[in-house]
Amino acid sequence: MAKKVAVIGAGVSGLISLKCCVDEGLEPTCFERTEDIGGVWRFKENVEDGRASIYQSVVTNTSKEMSCFSDFPMPEDFPNFLHNSKLLEYFRIFAKKFDLLKYIQFQTTVLSVRKCPDFSSSGQWKVVTQSNGKEQSAVFDAVMVCSGHHILPHIPLKSFPGMERFKGQYFHSRQYKHPDGFEGKRILVIGMGNSGSDIAVELSKNAAQVFISTRHGTWVMSRISEDGYPWDSVFHTRFRSMLRNVLPRTAVKWMIEQQMNRWFNHENYGLEPQNKYIMKEPVLNDDVPSRLLCGAIKVKSTVKELTETSAIFEDGTVEENIDVIIFATGYSFSFPFLEDSLVKVENNMVSLYKYIFPAHLDKSTLACIGLIQPLGSIFPTAELQARWVTRVFKGLCSLPSERTMMMDIIKRNEKRIDLFGESQSQTLQTNYVDYLDELALEIGAKPDFCSLLFKDPKLAVRLYFGPCNSYQYRLVGPGQWEGARNAIFTQKQRILKPLKTRALKDSSNFSVSFLLKILGLLAVVVAFFCQLQWS
């Protein structure tokens, strides 16, 4: 008999967990508290309690080729960076293709997940749910928690003396939907992550003035990288990841600083991070520097105090007549349906083996999917997590001892603090390519480069120097997909397809730039031999 698995949430992590369960012959049931799939990526005009919320203009920060699921490329005519509605369309196509909706119970809230009395031998869980006011319970062999970590708004009001005196409007960025109603106002955005920057840029087009307060500064990157390709298809390669791992930390930090300042000098714009040697996640925004140049946005330091109508900053400057304050100060998370002893959240941190498994359980039948912030796309990350977890549930992969897992958790946390710092917003941060490879190794899906160099050198070179996308993890091992190799070699075609909307005459393959390179090489050779002749 197939093992029954409860999947909590039908967002990105929940959908891919359903598919992985089906792929492994498990019997999943997904509980989704709302009426539809999509999680945080499904825009709604009104904020709902217990549900993630986005603003209407949200666009992905990771490109389609680096974000799609490993055996299901996005349509080639989809733009490279997707509006939330377009991404939701992809999820709907995905769910329909793999017939996932039949496993989902919508408008069903999970009230509790408790160990069964014989858990030490069975590993089973009693799950209590509520739908239309009626409670039900069922026993499952395993549970996948896919409820996300962008639900509880973090508003540190006590950190802002005088907040109680402020007479203007204030709210968390979670409540922001669109710029209507903010025309002509003087607005202060506190926090300069991706959401804070997006909101500041959008409001600055019609507001009287927008100020953005950043405590430590930040790097700002464009979505557009070398030769106009998406940033992550250039940044996330195995070769670059190797360099970041083997070079001295100072050299890596210097390289990152040079790369970030290539677009614009952050020091001149008042944005340079206070501690440049901490690997803080950069802000992805194509408009911030231009809005700063136009004066529509002004960067400010930390807010020291608020009065009835003004903000006083740590550097002594004061901005008067503030109408609105928006707190883009991130989120905290919790699991109210779980006992604290199962997944304990302290200071926005959880102690999970590889960000997935509680280490102390007698049976490894509870897993958290998507409770992580990789320096890359969450979608392939959650997929590899789910692929590994379902194989653990099935007994095809095993976990080490509790002691070994706890040592790994401690070591990983120390490394995270060393790389990313101790900020509450960085508690789930991890390197991207390294983590994907780590999970793939557990599954048996990591490509063997030494073997490929002899069997398929063209593919080996592409895997090492090209974009590290999800298709690579379908080349070998469990879940192997025969279309993976072709998907890797045709990704450039899918990147360029939505851009080629104007017909151009075919240009000669023997381009002027190529000719200049040949002439330059010949000039170097001639100069070398001339030097030998005269020496």
Curated annotation (Swiss-Prot):
<keyword id="KW-0832">Ubl conjugation</keyword>
<feature type="binding site">
    <location>
        <begin position="60"/>
        <end position="61"/>
    </location>
    <ligand>
        <name>NADP(+)</name>
    </ligand>
</feature>
<keyword id="KW-0285">Flavoprotein</keyword>
<keyword id="KW-0472">Membrane</keyword>
<dbReference type="GO" id="GO:0005789">
    <property type="term" value="C:endoplasmic reticulum membrane"/>
</dbReference>
<keyword id="KW-0274">FAD</keyword>
<feature type="transmembrane region" description="Helical">
    <location>
        <begin position="510"/>
        <end position="530"/>
    </location>
</feature>
<keyword id="KW-0492">Microsome</keyword>
<comment type="function">
    <text>Catalyzes the oxidative metabolism of numerous xenobiotics, including mainly therapeutic drugs and insecticides that contain a soft nucleophile, most commonly nitrogen and sulfur and participates to their bioactivation. Specifically catalyzes S-oxygenation of sulfur derived compounds such as thioureas-derived compounds, thioetherorganophosphates to their sulfenic acid. In vitro, catalyzes S-oxygenation of the second-line antitubercular drugs thiacetazone (TAZ) and ethionamide (ETA), forming a sulfinic acid and a carbodiimide via a postulated sulfenic acid intermediate.</text>
</comment>
<dbReference type="GO" id="GO:0050660">
    <property type="term" value="F:flavin adenine dinucleotide binding"/>
</dbReference>
<dbReference type="InterPro" id="IPR002254">
    <property type="entry name" value="Flavin_mOase_2"/>
</dbReference>
<feature type="binding site">
    <location>
        <begin position="195"/>
        <end position="198"/>
    </location>
    <ligand>
        <name>NADP(+)</name>
    </ligand>
</feature>
<dbReference type="GO" id="GO:0050661">
    <property type="term" value="F:NADP binding"/>
</dbReference>
<dbReference type="GO" id="GO:0072592">
    <property type="term" value="P:oxygen metabolic process"/>
</dbReference>
<feature type="modified residue" description="N-acetylalanine">
    <location>
        <position position="2"/>
    </location>
</feature>
<feature type="binding site">
    <location>
        <begin position="61"/>
        <end position="62"/>
    </location>
    <ligand>
        <name>FAD</name>
    </ligand>
</feature>
<dbReference type="GO" id="GO:0006082">
    <property type="term" value="P:organic acid metabolic process"/>
</dbReference>
<keyword id="KW-0007">Acetylation</keyword>
<keyword id="KW-0460">Magnesium</keyword>
<dbReference type="InterPro" id="IPR036188">
    <property type="entry name" value="FAD/NAD-bd_sf"/>
</dbReference>
<feature type="binding site">
    <location>
        <begin position="9"/>
        <end position="13"/>
    </location>
    <ligand>
        <name>FAD</name>
    </ligand>
</feature>
<keyword id="KW-0256">Endoplasmic reticulum</keyword>
<dbReference type="GO" id="GO:0046322">
    <property type="term" value="P:negative regulation of fatty acid oxidation"/>
</dbReference>
<dbReference type="GO" id="GO:0009404">
    <property type="term" value="P:toxin metabolic process"/>
</dbReference>
<keyword id="KW-1133">Transmembrane helix</keyword>
<dbReference type="InterPro" id="IPR050346">
    <property type="entry name" value="FMO-like"/>
</dbReference>
<keyword id="KW-0521">NADP</keyword>
<dbReference type="Pfam" id="PF00743">
    <property type="entry name" value="FMO-like"/>
</dbReference>
<feature type="binding site">
    <location>
        <position position="32"/>
    </location>
    <ligand>
        <name>FAD</name>
    </ligand>
</feature>
<keyword id="KW-0503">Monooxygenase</keyword>
<comment type="similarity">
    <text>Belongs to the FMO family.</text>
</comment>
<dbReference type="InterPro" id="IPR000960">
    <property type="entry name" value="Flavin_mOase"/>
</dbReference>
<feature type="binding site">
    <location>
        <begin position="40"/>
        <end position="41"/>
    </location>
    <ligand>
        <name>FAD</name>
    </ligand>
</feature>
<dbReference type="GO" id="GO:0016020">
    <property type="term" value="C:membrane"/>
</dbReference>
<keyword id="KW-0812">Transmembrane</keyword>
<dbReference type="GO" id="GO:0006805">
    <property type="term" value="P:xenobiotic metabolic process"/>
</dbReference>
<feature type="cross-link" description="Glycyl lysine isopeptide (Lys-Gly) (interchain with G-Cter in SUMO)">
    <location>
        <position position="492"/>
    </location>
</feature>
<dbReference type="GO" id="GO:0097009">
    <property type="term" value="P:energy homeostasis"/>
</dbReference>
<dbReference type="GO" id="GO:0004499">
    <property type="term" value="F:N,N-dimethylaniline monooxygenase activity"/>
</dbReference>
<keyword id="KW-1017">Isopeptide bond</keyword>
<keyword id="KW-0560">Oxidoreductase</keyword>
<dbReference type="GO" id="GO:0006739">
    <property type="term" value="P:NADP metabolic process"/>
</dbReference>
